[in-house]
Swiss-Prot record:
The keyword Disulfide bond does not apply. It is found in: Cell inner membrane. This is Magnesium transporter MgtE. Mg(2+) 7 binds at residues 428, 432. Changing residue 258 to Q: Abolishes the Mg(2+)-dependent suppression of the Mg(2+) influx. Highly selective magnesium channel that plays an important role in Mg(2+) homeostasis. Functions as a Mg(2+)-dependent gating channel. Exhibits low activity with cobalt, suggesting that it might also be involved in the uptake of Co(2+) as a micronutrient. Also exhibits low activity with Ca(2+), but it shows almost no activity with Mn(2+). Changing residue 285 to A: Abolishes Mg(2+)-transport activity. The gene is mgtE. It comes from Thermus thermophilus (strain ATCC 27634 / DSM 579 / HB8). The keyword Transmembrane applies. It catalyses: Mg(2+)(in) = Mg(2+)(out). The chain crosses the membrane at residues 284-306, 316-337, 352-381, 386-409, 421-443.
Length: 450
């Protein structure tokens, strides 16, 4: 947003200048206002939503968090509520009402009463679907025609239907029972002879999803096919809605956030850091940290078991951090590559043997390369007795950690656990435990032979 416009908005709010504020709000783009939203005081946000042109107010509201949506829908005056609800697209309206329903079921019913009967029925139909499925993402505001219509008839129909449709770039063809039969683009219509029938120019090979298709699969299909719109059908193949690219972008952001949380063993996928308190953050992180520290306690037992070796050659302790850190980093690299390959379907569970053999070679090459560097450091430190110990240990640690990182995602997927949730933290912990065991075992074996 232009700095001048942002300053004007803040000044108008501070001074309570309603006329100046209306002028700024007429000019401002909803996305620019959203970028400034967190900087506005609570009472100023309320004023902005009250005075914004209704289309812009609906756009801003649709991009707020569910908690904020519920808050404003419960506090705005009835006349303003009605205006905003009428402007929201059906899918955004359903999402906003669901946010209120979770907070206050009684008020949710009052909001529904503000809707006309047709809109209320459509919103209730959308509310039956899970939020993370295609049915929860779709909007029923699509354009569908019959295959027996001519191009001229379709164009006349589009002129009437376009104002209420989410998009008219793609027109879907259905039979008399509403079952999806084909698709054609607006371009197809424009270049076709007006007397041509839809059945002659439509594409009968339609890529679609069902109402219960997971949102991540919906996003993947749209990305793979470069679609801006994807039709949604019910269990009988009847067209019930469309998913548009703007909804998929929100899904991709949510899925990316969820995956990043999982990689760090934070198992609250919808966590918003700026809105979470200390207790919520503690609950999101503590469970896996407890599990991992209990696993990591094995390392103290290993150290106690090799106490005599460490006492005999105290310099062994100097290289524990770099050995374990290198093993953990190697395992995490390997796990990240495999998790991503599984997520993008570059690999599936049947590929584990091929991956195992490939990563054996990769692990050996990495181990030899890194061992060469660390052995040089050991020599420089003046510990020639430890050269074979550190060199052999690092090769084995890296080799083993690389295999663990590559195979663990396959094992977790086989067990029905999301690999992204525990792979990296678990790989790091297992690498520490096994790395320490390898290092001290090699030390005992080689030093006793000297």
């Amino acid at each position: 947003m232009e700095e001048k416009l942002a300053v004007s908005l803040q000044e108008a709010l501070q001074e309570g200048d309603t006329r100046a504020l209306r002028e700024v709000l007429e000019e401002i783009h909803p996305q620019d206002l959203l970028a400034l939203w967190d900087e506005l005081k609570g009472e100023h946000r309320y004023v902005v939503l009250t005075l914004l042109p209704k289309a812009k107010a609906a756009e801003v509201l649709s991009h707020l968090s569910p908690e904020e949506q519920a808050e404003y829908l419960k506090t705005l005056p009835p006349w303003r509520l009605r205006e905003i609800l009428e402007e929201l697209s059906l899918d955004d309206l359903a999402d906003a009402l669901q946010a209120v329903r979770k907070e206050d079921p009684a008020y949710f019913q009052r909001l529904k009463d503000l809707l006309d009967p047709r809109t209320r029925a459509e919103v209730e139909a959308l509310a039956r679907y899970e939020e993370d499925e295609a049915g929860g993402l779709m909007t029923p505001e699509y354009v569908a025609v019959r295959e027996g219509m001519t191009v001229e008839e379709v164009l006349r129909f589009l002129r009437r239907a376009a104002p209420d449709a989410e998009t008219i770039y793609y027109i879907y063809v259905v039979d008399e029972k509403g079952r999806l039969k084909g698709v054609l683009s607006l371009r197809d219509l424009i270049v076709a002879d007006p007397r041509t029938r839809v059945a002659e120019i439509m594409n009968p090979k339609v890529v679609y999803v069902r109402t219960d298709t997971d949102q991540e699969e919906v996003a993947r299909l749209m990305a793979d096919y470069d679609f801006t719109v994807l039709p949604v059908v019910d269990e009988e193949g009847r067209l019930v809605g469309i998913v548009t690219v703007d909804d998929v972008l929100d899904v991709l952001e949510a899925e990316a956030t969820e995956d990043i949380h999982k990689l760090g063993a934070v198992d609250v996928p919808d966590l918003v850091y700026s809105e979470a308190g200390p207790v919520a953050l503690w609950l999101a992180r503590v469970r896996w940290l407890v599990i991992l520290i209990l696993t990591g306690m094995v390392t103290s037992s290993i150290l106690q078991g090799f106490e005599s070796v460490l006492e005999a050659v105290t310099a062994l302790a100097f290289y524990v951090p770099v050995l374990l850190g290198t093993g953990g980093n190697t395992g995490n690299q390997s796990a990240t590559l495999i998790i991503r390959a599984l997520a993008t379907r570059d690999l599936d569970l049947r590929d584990w043997r091929r991956v195992f053999l490939k990563e054996m070679g990769v692990g050996l090459l990495l181990g030899l390369t890194l061992s060469f560097l660390l052995v040089g450091k050991v020599y420089w430190d003046g510990h020639p007795l430890l050269l074979p110990v550190v060199g052999v240990s690092l090769v084995l640690i890296v080799f083993f950690a690389n295999l663990v990182g590559a195979m663990l995602p396959f094992l977790l997927r086989r067990l029905g656990v999301d690999p992204a949730l525990v792979s990296n933290p678990l790989v790091a912990t297992l690498s520490d435990v096994t790395g320490l065991l390898i290092y001290l075992s090699v030390a005992r074996l080689l030093l006793e032979a000297v």
